[in-house]
Regions:
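Alpha-helical, largely C-terminal catalytic domains
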Residues: 1-401
């Protein structure tokens, strides 16, 4: 996603900007679990429960169960052959377009001012976050729930673009400091009035920080305090993963495969997956969420979803001139094999992780109905995420190295 353009900071807040240190230059054991009665969100009334995960490839995309729920983009999607994934449950182009339109309106608000440039607004719509949340959260009870997920998604990408991508001013050696400030946009600092005012001015000075602050406010309006706290914790873990990646990039060091997979457990889509209950209009109680088995299922589903991104984005990353690593490249380095062979080995790793998730989810789903519903949400996210990536093949993604 292309980074937003920073708004000019008023001279009166320049000192606060300096204190904040933020500027535009900163840097298979049966089917997966299902909801007992199927999805209940917008556009899902005629949908059947999703079949088990399938290996996608020459067989093409799964057939929609309702003409009203399948946009034209689904039939033209291209998928990585042999990649094992649950199929998407709900794909609604009109609903995705509505979400995208509302996102542009939100991003243009004075307290966000994320994408003031026309080209960047078009890039936001081209990124298609609306379709992502429609695919990944088929049980969302309304548009505002989908918007809550979409705002967080856009804010997370703005933080990644600004603070982690060199082409947008990110710097590996300053990443930790700016990410701590980004965390404070959703996990407020508590200081004396004087320094709290400086902190607020610091947040106001940067579009990524403004967007995360606003997105979190909307999310808190529909989430419970425990769900909001869970999101803050998962974002902090994500930033820990960003820092691990930044350290390797700073050293130009390719980690071992096992180390990379450890990094991926933190530097993953986990914050997007673990809000599945809040976006679905219910709550998995904190005590159940903290159960080791649930945590394992969350980690596996998050890793699988992020490795899916590794695979689809490999060609784009290889074309860039910067030092970068992903599962295929670390396997190629460790096994001394071609990138094509490493790509196939990465598919196998992804598929094994999805199957491990399915096994864990099936076991957990028998323990509590809310756990079963949460496991279904994770499964929906894996399938929706894969479909969204496949929909961008030929534009930002590819099905081979």
């Amino acid at each position: 996603m292309q980074a937003p353009t920073s708004r000019t900071t008023d001279p009166a807040t320049a000192a606060a900007d300096s204190a904040a240190g933020v500027s535009a230059t900163a840097g298979s054991v049966g089917p997966p679990p299902r909801l007992p009665s199927g999805p209940t969100g917008l556009g899902t009334s005629s949908l059947r429960l999703a079949p088990p995960a399938v290996e996608t490839g020459e067989s093409g995309p799964p057939q929609p169960s309702s003409p009203s729920s399948s946009p034209s983009s689904s039939s033209s999607s291209q998928r990585i052959e042999g990649l094992y994934s649950p199929p998407p449950v709900r794909d609604d182009r009109a609903l995705a377009d509505e979400i995208n339109g509302r996102l542009v309106e939100w991003a243009e608000q004075d307290d966000v001012d994320l994408y003031p440039d026309v080209d960047l607004r078009e890039a936001l719509v081209g990124f298609d976050p609306g379709r992502s949340v429609v695919l990944c959260h088929p049980d969302a009870p309304g548009v505002e729930h989908l918007m809550a997920a979409a705002r967080l998604l856009v804010g997370e990408n703005a933080v990644d673009d600004y603070f982690c991508e060199a082409e947008y001013g990110g710097s590996a050696d300053r990443r930790g400091a700016v990410l701590a400030l980004a965390q404070s946009a959703i996990d407020p600092a508590h200081n004396t009035p004087r320094y709290e005012a400086d902190w607020r001015s610091g947040l106001d000075s940067h579009p990524a920080l403004r967007s995360m602050r606003s997105a979190m406010g909307h999310f808190r309006a529909l989430a419970t305090p425990a769900q909001a706290h869970r999101y803050r914790h998962d974002i902090a873990s994500l930033y820990l993963g960003y820092n691990a990646e930044g350290d390797c990039i700073h050293q130009h060091r390719t980690p071992a495969v096992w180390e990379y997979l450890v990094q991926r457990q933190f530097n993953s889509f986990r914050p997007c997956l673990t809000i599945t209950d809040a976006i679905g209009g219910y709550e998995l109680p904190a005590a159940l969420f903290a159960e080791p088995g649930v945590q394992r299922a969350v980690a596996l589903s998050s890793n699988a979803s992020t490795i899916c991104n590794d695979l689809y984005s490999l060609r784009k990353e290889q074309r860039s001139e910067r030092f970068h690593y992903s599962l295929p490249t670390v396997i190629a380095a460790e096994d001394d094999c071609s990138i094509e062979d490493a790509f196939q080995k990465s598919i196998e790793v992804h598929n094994d992780i999805v199957r491990l998730f399915e096994e864990q989810a099936a076991e957990l789903s028998a323990t509590h109905p809310l756990v079963a519903r949460f496991m279904t949400g994770l499964s929906n996210w894996i399938g929706g995420n894969h479909e969204w990536h496949a929909g961008h093949v030929g534009k930002r993604y590819a099905t081979s190295p």
